[in-house]
């Protein structure tokens, strides 16, 4: 039984050895040493002493066995030589070194002394030719892969970046048998690399040469293989690429380069985040972490775009418990599933369904779980929809905020952070006006909380603040997903007005700054924190760049159609009202707007009247709101 098992094991190993390659190696080794002997005697066979011919016949079998065994031990018969590179070359060197040690051992065993040149020339030739035949196979494979006729090529590719990521992309294109594509040229900002080659592909110039090279090689696809470049640099290169009619794709990020997953299948189309060119926001992670750690955190609207990202970033900071509260069970379920998969039992995660309009539900949750921090993200945010359903904006946004804030005071919550919007500044729509009322509510509640604590002789009170920012990319109400769908459908791409501008920020950026602002709120309670959204973006320009970077020409392949401003929409957004002033913080991306003085008692009376009007579906709700928010002038 053991004999059969041993035989089976040997046969299995033999199966992994290329017999044909081993025979070829044997012939090369025998020929190399014989050739070395002929060189020693000036290619006159008759001059060779019989001692040397007999010695050659005696040792060559040993040399062949030793070389073949070494090549096998270093897996050179198992390598896929079509993809051979430095790794295989290094292993060939190791195999040759150990083989030469074997040659020395054979000499001491047999005591057959051959000419010194026999060992040197024979050894070098055997290494050179056994290695050469392997890399010749690779060269022939590359020639075969790149022997596709230009007529058969569908994608004519330019790679931007001559670094590791660029090389990986080029190699994959070269070795792929299924892609009808070819990399024609590379560009890199390092001028020293120009006129050099990567795997036979010429580095033709720098970023300024992209348009000319695209025309020269009839390029229809540009790949950005510069994951470690600053966002600003990537944006500048994209600006150049957008002047061509090429489709532009990019590697997702430097992580793919670090973990070795740079691949054609991981390429993605250029997104608006790339066009913004914003570098990563700076936040004090240690201070934020200490602020969140071991606290019970409640996130209302925790399944929404902002709320779910708040949950993700809070979960990273080791809270005592994280409570996801949302009226939409589907949204809450998906973020719950994501966080459970990532953190398992290490995160105390509670997912609850309910409405911020239901005071009893809020009381029961706060009574049971006793949150330390509340991030209030639950809100209706869609401007045109709220114009048609203004009473719902009041019920959910305004009264919902009042309910959560009131419950927070009564249940001794330490910090309350409202997620607001720049549409609350001089609002032209009911959604923005409702969010301005929310800001006024939390400023009133901050004063109330402070006053109640003083009356009771307490130093601890609920500190309220709001964080105001503009449009976030990827949110449910963002225009960007609409643009993408319209481009995929062949157009038209609809823009409300040629001159409309907006501030944009990614959701993770916005939430990171929200958490930083929440930390500052320990000192600046009652204030509105305003996030720096960078430079404003012209929506028309953004739409046209997205079309170009998708490989189409605006107004030729895909129409850009202007539909007119929607109800409640304005051409530009503002960050602060004049009366709020502007105070800087240690984080240059966060500023502070101070509360505008108001009569809290009068405001409460107005709130009660507003609630009654909304609950009775008053047709005059917008006019009532305008009496409370003087800068809001309804259009109808």
Regions from the PLM with identified roles:
Residues 1-153, 157, 178-181, 194, ...:
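Signature of alpha-helical transmembrane segments in polytopic membrane proteins
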Residues 2, 234-296, 409:
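Flexible, Lys/Arg-rich cytosolic regulatory linkers and terminal tails that connect or flank
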Residues 30, 34, 38, 57, ...:
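A solvent-exposed beta-alpha-beta segment
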Residues 214, 218-220, 319-320, 366, ...:
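Proline-aspartate-enriched helix->loop->beta-strand connector
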Residues 235-251, 321-328, 373, 388-415:
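NAD(P)-cofactor binding segment of oxidoreductase domains
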Residues 260, 376, 382-383, 387-439, ...:
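Conserved Rossmann-fold NAD(P)-dependent oxidoreductase catalytic core, especially the SDR/UDP-sugar
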Residues 265-269, 273, 277-370, 581:
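N-terminal Rossmann/SDR dinucleotide-binding element
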Residues 282, 287-291, 444-636:
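Strand-loop microenvironment adjacent to phosphate/nucleotide-handling motifs in alpha/beta enzyme folds
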């Amino acid at each position: 039984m053991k004999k059969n098992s041993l035989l089976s094991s040997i046969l299995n190993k033999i199966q992994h050895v290329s017999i044909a390659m081993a025979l070829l190696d044997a012939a090369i080794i025998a020929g190399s040493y014989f050739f070395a002997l002929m060189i020693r005697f000036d290619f006159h066979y008759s001059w060779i002493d019989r001692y040397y011919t007999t010695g050659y016949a005696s040792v060559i079998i040993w040399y062949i066995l030793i070389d073949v065994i070494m090549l096998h031990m270093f897996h050179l018969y198992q390598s896929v030589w079509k993809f051979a590179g430095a790794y295989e070359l290094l292993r060939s060197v190791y195999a040759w070194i150990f083989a030469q040690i074997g040659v020395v051992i054979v000499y001491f065993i047999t005591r057959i002394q051959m000419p010194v040149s026999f060992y040197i020339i024979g050894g070098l030739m055997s290494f050179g030719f056994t290695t050469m035949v392997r890399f010749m196979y690779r060269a022939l494979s590359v020639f075969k892969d790149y022997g596709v006729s230009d007529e058969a090529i569908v994608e004519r590719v330019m790679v931007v970046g001559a670094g590791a990521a660029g090389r990986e992309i080029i190699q994959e294109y070269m070795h792929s048998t299924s892609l009808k594509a070819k990399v024609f040229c590379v560009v890199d900002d390092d001028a020293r690399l120009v006129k050099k080659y990567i795997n036979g592909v010429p580095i033709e110039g720098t970023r300024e040469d992209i348009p000319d090279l695209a025309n020269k090689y009839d390029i229809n696809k540009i790949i950005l293989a510069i994951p470690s470049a600053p966002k600003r640099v990537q944006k500048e290169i994209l600006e150049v690429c957008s002047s061509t009619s090429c489709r532009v794709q990019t590697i997702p990020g430097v992580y793919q380069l670090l973990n070795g997953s740079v691949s054609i299948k991981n390429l993605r189309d250029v997104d608006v985040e790339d066009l913004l060119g914003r570098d990563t926001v700076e936040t004090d992670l240690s201070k934020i972490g200490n602020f969140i750690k071991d606290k019970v955190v409640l996130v209302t609207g925790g399944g929404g775009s902002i709320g779910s990202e708040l949950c993700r970033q809070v979960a990273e900071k080791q809270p005592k418990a994280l409570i996801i509260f949302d009226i939409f069970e589907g949204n809450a379920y998906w973020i719950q599933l994501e966080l459970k998969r990532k953190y398992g039992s290490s995160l105390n995660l509670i997912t609850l369904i309910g409405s911020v309009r239901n005071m009893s539900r809020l009381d029961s949750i706060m009574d049971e779980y006793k949150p330390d921090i509340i991030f209030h993200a639950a809100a209706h945010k869609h401007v045109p929809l709220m114009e048609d359903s203004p009473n719902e904006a009041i019920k959910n946004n305004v009264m919902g905020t009042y309910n959560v804030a009131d419950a927070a005071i009564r249940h001794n919550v330490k910090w309350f952070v409202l997620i607001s919007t720049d549409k609350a500044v001089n609002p032209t729509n009911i959604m923005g006006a409702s969010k301005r009322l929310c800001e006024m509510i939390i400023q009133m509640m901050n004063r109330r909380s402070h006053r109640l604590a003083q009356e009771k002789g307490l130093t601890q009170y609920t500190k309220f603040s709001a964080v105001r920012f503009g449009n976030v990319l990827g949110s449910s109400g963002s225009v960007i997903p609409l643009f993408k769908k319209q481009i995929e459908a062949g157009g038209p791409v609809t823009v409300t007005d040629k001159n409309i501008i907006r501030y944009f920020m990614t959701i993770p950026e916005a939430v990171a700054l929200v958490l930083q602002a929440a930390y500052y709120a320990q000192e600046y309670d009652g204030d509105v924190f305003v996030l720096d959204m960078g430079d404003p973006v012209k929506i028309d320009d953004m739409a046209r760049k997205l079309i170009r970077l998708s490989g189409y020409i605006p107004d030729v392949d895909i129409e850009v159609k202007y539909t007119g401003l929607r109800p409640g929409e304005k051409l530009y957004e503002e960050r602060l009202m004049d009366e709020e002033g502007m105070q800087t913080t240690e984080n240059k991306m966060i500023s502070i707007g101070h509360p505008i003085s108001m009569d809290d008692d009068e405001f409460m009376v107005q709130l009660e009247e507003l609630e009654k009007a909304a609950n009775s579906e008053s047709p005059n709700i917008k006019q009532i709101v305008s009496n409370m928010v003087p800068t809001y002038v309804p259009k109808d």
